[in-house]
Amino acid sequence: MRRTIQVRITSGERHFVAQCLDLSVVTQAATLDQLAINIREAISLHLEGESLADLGFSPNPTILATMELESVA
């Protein structure tokens, strides 16, 4: 059973985008603080009424977000 739900964050021209790697969830926001709120809400709504065990997750999984940065070279 997985204990984390993985999310990749990328930066667009105007917004940050969070894409869940484990579920079909995508959201965006103008700030990282708002993005954190949005991704929690989107994942919560996606999982509503679902069995976490059937999806391969342990009870109360955490969200692990990784931010993709532009190359420095």
PLM regions with names:
Residues 1-8, 33-73:
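Short, charged, surface-exposed hinge/linker loops at domain edges
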Residues 5, 16, 25-27:
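Structural detector for hydrophobic anchor residues on beta-strands
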Residues 8-20:
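Short aromatic-glycine-(Arg/Gly/Cys) micro-motifs in beta-strand/loop hairpins
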Residues 17-19, 28, 37:
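Short acidic, gly/pro-rich beta-turn/loop elements at beta-sheet edges
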Residues 23-33:
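A short, exposed loop/beta-hairpin motif centered on an aromatic-Gly-Thr core
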